């Protein structure tokens, strides 16, 4: 199985499966001299890890990261400095229950990658989905923590903006609320609505999708490239690579098709500091594939988890028709834990373009 790496200069390879002994990543191309601690990486992994509320899978993994290479440990025994060599990080799996998946070893879950993997490879790891499991994304979050350090002043934040047909009230958007509730939503007024809705979904053994918005501030104007190397192109590609993501939009996205040219254009003026400012940000911080200096805004849609208790019609590996009902521990809304994953992927895309821009132009 190939295609386990992404990026050009800031290149990330992830490895491991849902029910293997461990998973991890190798970050190649990280510049030397960047300092960080394992605790900083852990803080992002803790946002993604399972078992933190009744609205996510009850699989309990500490997701404790270990940095194995590519750094020098400082005299304080905590601070690490990158050497420019590959940074390898590992996260052990400690709460696998492979016996829960015995019934689906030869069955294809509708909406899951089971059938597609079998068609391509002739074999699949049915235990928790193997490589197609969202468990793999823990490694991406670790890589994203390093990526945030590459671009000076970069801040990447994400929030859940809808679950099913329930949207937040954007007039109540408050970033400070995101870490104060189990849904990573910026609208405190939506917490009870989401909770009541997901309680019903969870009790019925069903699942539901979500939409997540990522905002990156401090993105240097000029990074990116035209035509086939666009910044927004790569952000979309990185986000689409996340398990269960079925759609991505940048800035106004599909809504731009409903606007006139006058409504959609981001007008400009000179700021008091003598630098250009945009009076709106319909473009989501990218024009012609190149960052404008405005916040980069992306949204992605996550489909409902395929593993549900409701019997669904399918077939098995022998070609027999079966009804599939998935047991085990699963997220009623996998979109909740996709928030830190989306942040990580956007950070990796920006870090890669930052290094490419610096290498091509000598400017940042």
Swiss-Prot record:
Family: Belongs to the chorismate synthase family.
Cofactors (names): FMNH2
Pfam families: Chorismate_synt (PF01264)
Residue sites binding FMN per the record: 131-133, 243-244, 288, 303-307, 329
This protein's GO CC annotations: cytosol
Cross-referenced HAMAP family: Chorismate_synth
PANTHER family named in the record: CHORISMATE SYNTHASE
Single GO biological process annotation from the record: aromatic amino acid family biosynthetic process
Pathway: Metabolic intermediate biosynthesis; chorismate biosynthesis; chorismate from D-erythrose 4-phosphate and phosphoenolpyruvate: step 7/7
Residues at which NADP(+) binds: 48
Organism for this UniProt entry: Brucella melitensis biotype 2 (strain ATCC 23457)
Recorded superkingdom: Bacteria
A GO MF label: FMN binding
Keywords of this entry: Amino-acid biosynthesis, Aromatic amino acid biosynthesis, FAD, Flavoprotein, FMN, Lyase, NADP
UniProt protein name: Chorismate synthase
Co-factor remark: Reduced FMN (FMNH(2)).
Catalytic activity: 5-O-(1-carboxyvinyl)-3-phosphoshikimate = chorismate + phosphate
Gene from which this protein is expressed: aroC
Oligomeric form and interacting partners: Homotetramer.
E.C. designation(s): 4.2.3.5
General function of this protein: This reaction introduces a second double bond into the aromatic ring system.
């Amino acid at each position: 199985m190939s295609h386990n790496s992404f990026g050009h200069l800031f290149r990330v390879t992830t490895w491991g499966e849902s029910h293997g002994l461990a998973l991890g990543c190798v970050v190649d191309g990280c510049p030397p001299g960047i300092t960080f601690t394992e605790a900083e990486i852990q803080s992002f992994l803790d946002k993604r890890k399972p078992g933190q509320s009744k609205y996510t899978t009850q699989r309990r993994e500490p997701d404790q990261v270990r940095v194995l290479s590519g750094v020098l440990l400082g005299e304080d025994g905590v601070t690490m400095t990158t050497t420019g060599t590959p940074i390898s990080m590992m996260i052990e799996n400690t709460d696998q229950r492979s016996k829960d998946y015995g019934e689906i070893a030869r069955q294809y879950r509708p909406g899951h990658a089971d059938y597609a993997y079998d068609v391509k490879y002739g074999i699949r790891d049915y235990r928790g989905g193997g490589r197609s499991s969202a468990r793999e994304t823990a490694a991406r979050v670790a890589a994203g923590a390093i990526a945030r350090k590459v671009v000076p002043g970069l801040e990447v934040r994400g929030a859940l903006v809808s679950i099913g047909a329930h949207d937040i009230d954007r007039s109540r958007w408050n970033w400070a609320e995101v870490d104060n509730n189990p849904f990573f939503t910026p609208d405190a007024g939506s917490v009870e609505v989401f909770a009541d809705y997901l309680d019903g979904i969870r009790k019925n053994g069903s699942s539901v999708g979500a939409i997540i918005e990522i905002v990156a501030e401090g993105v240097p104007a000029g990074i990116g490239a035209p035509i086939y190397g666009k910044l927004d192109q790569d952000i979309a590609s990185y986000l689409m690579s996340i398990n269960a993501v079925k759609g991505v939009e940048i800035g106004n996205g599909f809504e731009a098709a409903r606007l006139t040219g006058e409504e959609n254009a981001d007008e400009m003026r000179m700021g008091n500091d003598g630098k250009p400012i945009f009076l709106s940000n319909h473009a989501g911080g990218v024009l012609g594939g190149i960052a404008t200096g405005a916040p980069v805004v992306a949204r992605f849609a996550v489909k409902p988890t395929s593993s549900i208790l409701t019997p669904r019609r399918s077939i098995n590996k022998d070609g027999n028709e079966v009804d599939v009902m998935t047991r085990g521990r699963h997220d009623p809304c996998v979109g909740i834990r996709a928030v830190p994953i989306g942040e990580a992927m956007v950070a990796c895309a920006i870090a890669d373009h930052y290094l490419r821009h610096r290498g091509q132009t000598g400017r940042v």
